[in-house]
């Protein structure tokens, strides 16, 4: 099929790679280059870089105006495929392809509609998630469901690891969806909007560890935000990102207070419920390190506290 593909982050690269080996991708639409990092270096999206490497035509519109509409119309797509593009499509664009627009969404809709379904489901401690292929409408992930595939969530998995798994599944599922779409056998099941939950974009405050929360909630926050953007706390006036932790058995101390900091008992910090065993962390301006290396270098004392 002749396809216009819309996507931006790394999650959207795997489906695009799969599509170009099975279909004709006539045009790729992605977000414009943007400044990122401390040096504010201008970088291209992963989808743009992949498309250029594979000699695909790419456009990076700031908004959907008449010029963009005409560019998409000119390639005569049979279907538009979207994966984490980052913008809602106006009706004029949705109405261009005769087979409609399909979205690859990283949750089991109607749950976790929105921009950050992977992080939000991990932060909530969900045991299951998946991929949904849906027919797009003008709403935020409100269209009819075509296909879904469930994935059990290992309680140690990180956001980055889950994203890779879901990208692979999404790539396979969109190929199956397009095959059935062309054959006339792709289902359309309306969502139960009363069951809808939402996954809003991550904010800076989502990165802050609140030690009054339970150890399980903090552990879920840490793994959800690994590797980007990371969850952090403050120790001796400086930020420290915590990359890996597990729930411990100790409780009864002030939240944030160091309970143990030795090789026998590990690095245990009190929370609002139980203790949090810190396994891997990264001081501001430094490299990731094990808890043992942190103890050797910083010598934290029992009774010292991590700030919220």
Swiss-Prot record:
The keyword Oxidoreductase does not apply. It catalyses: L-methionyl-tRNA(fMet) + (6R)-10-formyltetrahydrofolate = N-formyl-L-methionyl-tRNA(fMet) + (6S)-5,6,7,8-tetrahydrofolate + H(+). It is an enzyme of class 2 (transferase). Its EC number is 2.1.2.9. GO terms for molecular function: methionyl-tRNA formyltransferase activity. PROSITE patterns: GART. Keywords: Protein biosynthesis, Transferase. HAMAP family: Formyl_trans. Attaches a formyl group to the free amino group of methionyl-tRNA(fMet). The formyl group appears to play a dual role in the initiator identity of N-formylmethionyl-tRNA by promoting its recognition by IF2 and preventing the misappropriation of this tRNA by the elongation apparatus. This is Methionyl-tRNA formyltransferase. It comes from Carboxydothermus hydrogenoformans (strain ATCC BAA-161 / DSM 6008 / Z-2901). The lineage of its organism: Bacteria, Bacillati, Bacillota, Clostridia, Thermoanaerobacterales.
């Amino acid at each position: 099929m002749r396809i216009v593909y819309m996507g931006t982050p790394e999650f959207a690269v795997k489906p695009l790679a799969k599509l170009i080996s099975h279909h004709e991708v006539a045009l790729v639409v992605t977000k414009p280059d943007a400044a990122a990092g401390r040096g504010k270096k201008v970088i291209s999206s992963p989808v743009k870089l992949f498309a250029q490497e594979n000699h695909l035509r790419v456009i990076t519109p700031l908004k959907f105006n008449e010029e963009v509409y005409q560019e998409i119309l000119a390639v005569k797509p049979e279907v538009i495929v979207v994966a984490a593009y980052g913008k809602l499509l106006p009706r004029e664009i949705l109405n261009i392809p005769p087979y409609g627009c399909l979205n690859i969404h990283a949750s089991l809709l109607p749950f976790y509609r929105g921009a950050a379904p992977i992080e939000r489901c991990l932060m909530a401690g969900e045991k299951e998630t998946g991929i949904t292929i849906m027919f797009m409408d003008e709403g935020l992930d409100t269209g009819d469901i075509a296909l879904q595939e469930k994935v059990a969530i290992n309680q140690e998995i990180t956001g980055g690891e889950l994203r890779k798994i879901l990208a692979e599944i999404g790539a396979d599922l969109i190929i199956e969806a397009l095959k059935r779409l062309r054959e006339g056998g792709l289902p359309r099941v309306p969502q139960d909007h009363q069951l809808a939950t939402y996954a809003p974009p991550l904010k800076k405050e989502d990165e802050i560890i609140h030690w009054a929360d339970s150890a399980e909630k903090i552990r879920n926050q840490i793994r959800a935000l690994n590797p980007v953007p990371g969850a952090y706390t403050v120790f001796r006036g400086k930020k420290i990102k915590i990359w890996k932790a597990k729930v411990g058995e100790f409780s009864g101390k002030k939240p944030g207070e160091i309970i143990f900091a030795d090789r026998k008992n590990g690095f245990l910090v009190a929370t609002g419920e139980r203790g949090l065993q810190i396994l891997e962390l990264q001081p501001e301006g430094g490299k990731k390190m094990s808890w043992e290396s942190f103890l050797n270098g910083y010598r934290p004392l029992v009774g010292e506290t991590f700030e919220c």
